[in-house]
């Protein structure tokens, strides 16, 4: 999966998908009442990017629904995965549950169109703070109460704060998620800084272990060609980047073209191959 990074304005969706992204990451902010408000990343953000682009969350969800609904004139066939980077710093342990319910209700109405020919992309809820695991409880509770528990088949989870993997496993258990159950594990840092692949390799080992909790692993934010190659050599499932075309270029190289291909809608992002 080639994950376009910080795709927070509607106009950026095509700008990232057309050069090769089949997934996009969207930053979500919450107001003081734990309600999703904007698609927005404050300053600072990645080097060589413009921080501060934003949309009202409901309008963005409608736009990305159009981009992922077959038959819509704005349909982008390649876009198959949405990663919502949930900026939960304004929440606490109790309001995280409320935020999860609110976000599920917004997705149900504005993205899934209340279950009637809505967007088809898979969804990853990426939470930076393990203490906010109750978001994961509130989200399915809202869908269940609305009679749309089937949509949880399209939803996965990620804790993105670079915590110890066993700490994340415990947080998932507290949230009622056991075993390898729709779990992506991220690792990374802003493209302005460097970070080793040590934790990525540990996550890959966990993914490939019979007693691990991880289904898929992705690394962020990867912009340099050399780092893209190193990341692929670590056997990740996804690369988050500001330059999707660079990942496409590397995937065409002989040593990678026989080992990797771009994921399509038929590839379940929550299954470990």
Swiss-Prot record:
* Expressed in which tissues: Expressed by the venom gland.
The protein's location, in the record's own words, is: Secreted
Q: Which SUPFAM superfamilies match?
A: PLC-like phosphodiesterases (SSF51695)
Active site as annotated: 5, 41
| Enzyme class label | lyase
Report a single Gene Ontology molecular function.
phosphoric diester hydrolase activity
Question: Entry cofactor note text?
Answer: Binds 1 Mg(2+) ion per subunit.
Please indicate if the UniProt record lists Cell membrane as a keyword: no
Q: List the disulfide bonds.
A: 45-51, 47-192
| Main location as per UniProt | secreted
Q: Which cofactor does it need?
A: Mg(2+)
Instruction: Cite the EC number.
Output: 4.6.1.-
Q: Where does Mg(2+) bind?
A: 25, 27, 85
Q: Which Pfam families match?
A: GDPD_2
Q: Which GO terms describe its cellular component?
A: extracellular region
GO BP, one example?
killing of cells of another organism
Q: What is the protein's known function?
A: Dermonecrotic toxins cleave the phosphodiester linkage between the phosphate and headgroup of certain phospholipids (sphingolipid and lysolipid substrates), forming an alcohol (often choline) and a cyclic phosphate. This toxin acts on sphingomyelin (SM). It may also act on ceramide phosphoethanolamine (CPE), lysophosphatidylcholine (LPC) and lysophosphatidylethanolamine (LPE), but not on lysophosphatidylserine (LPS), and lysophosphatidylglycerol (LPG). It acts by transphosphatidylation, releasing exclusively cyclic phosphate products as second products.
**Family indicated by similarity:** Belongs to the arthropod phospholipase D family. Class II subfamily.
Name of the featured protein? Dermonecrotic toxin LarSicTox-alphaVII1
């Amino acid at each position: 999966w080639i994950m376009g990074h910080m795709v927070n304005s509607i106009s950026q969706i095509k700008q990232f998908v057309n050069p090769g992204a089949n997934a996009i990451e969207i930053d979500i902010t919450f107001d003081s009442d734990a309600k999703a408000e904007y698609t927005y990343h404050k300053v600072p953000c990645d080097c060589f990017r413009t921080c501060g682009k934003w949309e009202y969350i409901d309008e963005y969800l409608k736009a990305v629904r159009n981009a992922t609904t077959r038959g819509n004139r704005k349909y982008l066939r390649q876009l198959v995965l949405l990663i919502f980077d949930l900026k939960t710093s304004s929440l606490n342990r109790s309001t995280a549950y409320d935020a999860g319910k609110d976000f599920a209700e917004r997705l149900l109405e504005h993205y899934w169109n209340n279950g009637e020919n809505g967007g088809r992309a898979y969804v990853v809820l990426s939470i930076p703070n393990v203490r906010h695991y109750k978001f994961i409880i509130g989200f399915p509770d809202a869908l269940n109460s609305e009679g749309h528990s089937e949509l949880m088949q399209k939803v996965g989870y990620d804790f993105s704060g670079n915590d110890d993997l066993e700490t994340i496993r415990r947080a998932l258990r507290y949230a009622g998620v056991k075993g390898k159950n729709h779990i992506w594990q991220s690792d990374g840092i802003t493209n302005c800084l460097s970070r080793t692949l040590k934790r990525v390799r540990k996550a890959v080992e966990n993914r490939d272990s019979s007693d691990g909790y991880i289904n898929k692993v992705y690394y962020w934010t990867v912009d340099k060609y050399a780092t893209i190659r190193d990341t692929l050599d670590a056997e990740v499932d996804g690369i988050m980047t500001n330059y999707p075309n660079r990942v496409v270029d590397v995937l065409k190289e002989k040593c990678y073209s026989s080992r990797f291909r771009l994921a399509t809608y038929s590839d379940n992002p929550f299954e470990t191959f």
